C-alpha cells in the first residue's frame, strides 16, 4: 500500500530467500491461472493496494484485505450500536488494573498461523503466542519500518518510544531489546503497561496495524513481506494478480464458530461465503455497470452520474432496482474529506492569509450540488455523530470578496505573484484519474480562478499519490480520512506534530499549543474538561486553515439480491466473514 520512505528494518539481515521465493512463485502461478474461486464467493470492486503488510494498512482497501488474513487482539463488534469492541485473538476483554495503566490479555489457544516453510518445513504451522504480539507491536514502533500506524502506540506504552528512538540508528533493529510496557508473561498471557490512562488505546488494538504476525516469517521474507503470509485470520490469500484481482479463500481447519454472529432475519438458510474476490476497478461507471450485470454483490461510492438512477426523489431506492431484488442501506459516514496544504511548502505552508483566502474561495453549496446531495458540507475536522463537533460555520467559509482581500493581505493583490508579475500558480495533487475526480478537481480550480489564482491539477494512481504525500512533495492535495474509531481524538490526531508524514498528519501541521491540548485531552478523565479541549483544538485548526474542509460523505450501499446478513458498519474490517449468500 504505502511506499516505505525509509529503509526496511530487515534489509541488512540475511533472508531465507527460498521461502520468500516459494511464496512469490505460488502467488504468481495462481494469479496467472486465475482459477475459478470456490462458491459461494463474495465479489466486490475495490482499489488497488501495493502490500498486505498490515503495518501499512492505512487505506480502507488495504485494511479490509489485511483484516481477512490477519487477526488482532480485539475487533469491532459487528452488531453493537453504539460501536464497541469485542475479543478476537484474545479470549476475553483485557483485565485492567485499578490505576488504568496495566492491561492483561489472555490469547485464545486456537489462534494458529497458516503453513509456512519458515516454521520448519513445507506445511509447518504453529500456534500464535504472546511473544508474537510483543514482536508485532515492536515492529510497528520500528523507525526503520516507518509505518503510518505508529500513532496508535506513540507516547502510550512504557518504554516503546525509547525503543523507537533506538531503532532509528544505522544498526539492525534489536527486537530482543527490553520494552518494560510489553511483556509476554507466558505463551498465552500478554501484559501492556501504559504511561498514562488512555481511554482510546484499546480501539487501536482492533486496527489492522496491530495484527499479530509470526516473527520468523516476517524475518524470512524481509523487505518482501506483504503477500499475506502465514496469517491466522478467517481467510488466506489464494492468488493475487497485482493491480487486477485478489482472491481469498476460507482458512482450512479454522473453527467456523469463531466467525459466527447472530443472524439477521434475511440470513435464514443462507450459506457463509467460502471465498472473497476483490477486483480492481477505478472507474465508477464501470463499477456500476458491473454491479447491474451481477458481477458484484455490493456497490458503494455511487457516482454522481449514477445517483439519479439509484435514488428516487423521495430518497428511497429507485423502483427498477428494487424490482431486481437490490436493497439499499444509507446513513452519514464517519469520514471527512479535506483539501490539505503541505505546511512544509514554502508558499502555502508559511502564509496563513493565503490558506484562509483559498478556504474563503471554496463554494460548499456548489460542491454539494455537484455531488447531488451525496455530500454533507463540512465546517471542521469532525464528522456528524462524533462527540464534541462544532456545528457552526467555519470562520473562513465561502466569501469571494473576503478571499480577494485576504489574497492582498497575503502579498498577492488581485492574485498576482509579485515575484513573477503573473497569477499565483499552485498545484493540487489528486489520487485518481477517473472522471468524477477530474470534474471535482476542475470545479475546485474554478473556485480559485474566480479570485485570481491559477491551480494546476496533477493526477496519479492512488499509490503514486500517497508516495508523493508521504514524501512531502505535494503542495496541496485532496484526501479523505475515514475514522478508525468513533472518538474525536481519532480525527484531531491528524494535526499532532509527531504524526507528520508518513504518519496520518499528512499536512505536516506543527503547533506546540495544539500538541499540548491534544496531550492533555488524551489523558483527561473528566468529560467536561475533555470536551473543552476538543473544542479548543477544533477552534485552532479551523482558524489556522491547514485544511479546507470539503465535506462528509453520505454512505449509500446497494446490496445484490443474494447478499445476506449485511449490516452497514463504519469499521467493516473482516466483515465478509459474517456475510451470507442466499440459495
How would you label these PLM feature ranges?
Residues 39-48, 102-105, 133-136, 190-191, ...:
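Short, well-ordered beta-strand elements
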Residues 45-98, 230:
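N-terminal lobe/hinge region of extracytoplasmic solute-binding protein
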Residues 79-80, 161-189, 193-277, 283-286, ...:
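Gly/Pro-rich hinge or "lid" segments in bacterial periplasmic/extracellular proteins
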Residues 92-152, 191, 278, 287-290, ...:
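Aromatic- and charge-enriched surface segment that lines or borders ligand/interaction sites
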Residues 238-249, 265, 279-344, 369:
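Extracellular/periplasmic solute-recognition and catalytic clefts
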Residues 249-250, 260, 349-446, 450, ...:
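Append "and occasionally in soluble cytosolic enzymes with long acidic Gly/Pro-rich linkers
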Residues 323-325, 356, 360, 368, ...:
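Extracytoplasmic/peripheral linker and loop segments enriched in polar/acidic and small residues
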Residues 557-583:
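Long beta-strand-rich cores associated with HINT superfamily self-processing modules
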